Amino acid sequence: MAFLKKSLFLVLFLGLVSLSICEEEKREEENEEVQEDDDQSEEKRGFLDVVKHVGKAVGKAALNAVNDLVNQGEQ
């Protein structure tokens, strides 16, 4: 009976250790995914900033061109 108890405790202990290791690996994978998502959102944010600046420049150029045409038409 004592042998059976020791075997059972050993099996439970090893199962608990393996479960703990699996949970730790799962947490690490989730953290890596979160970091990848953060990196991707930063890249998107950087891309949108570039698009915004280009849009402003194009808008200003178009506005200046329209103003020049209007001023030429008035003269």
Curated annotation (Swiss-Prot):
GO terms (BP aspect): defense response
Tagged with keyword Signal: yes
Modified-residue entries (Glutamine amide), positions: 72
Annotated signal sequence range: 1-22
Cited InterPro entries: Frog_antimicrobial_propeptide, FSAP
Key words of the record: Amidation, Amphibian defense peptide, Antimicrobial, Cleavage on pair of basic residues, Secreted, Signal
Biased composition (Acidic residues): 30-41
Top-level lineage group: Eukaryota
Cell compartments where the protein resides: Secreted
One Gene Ontology cellular component: extracellular region
Segments for region (Disordered): 25-44
Pfam family, one: FSAP_sig_propep
Expression sites (tissue/organ): Expressed by the skin glands.
General function of this protein: Has antimicrobial activity.
Family the entry assigns: Belongs to the frog skin active peptide (FSAP) family. Cruzioseptin subfamily.
UniProt protein name: Cruzioseptin-12
Higher taxonomy: Eukaryota, Metazoa, Chordata, Craniata, Vertebrata
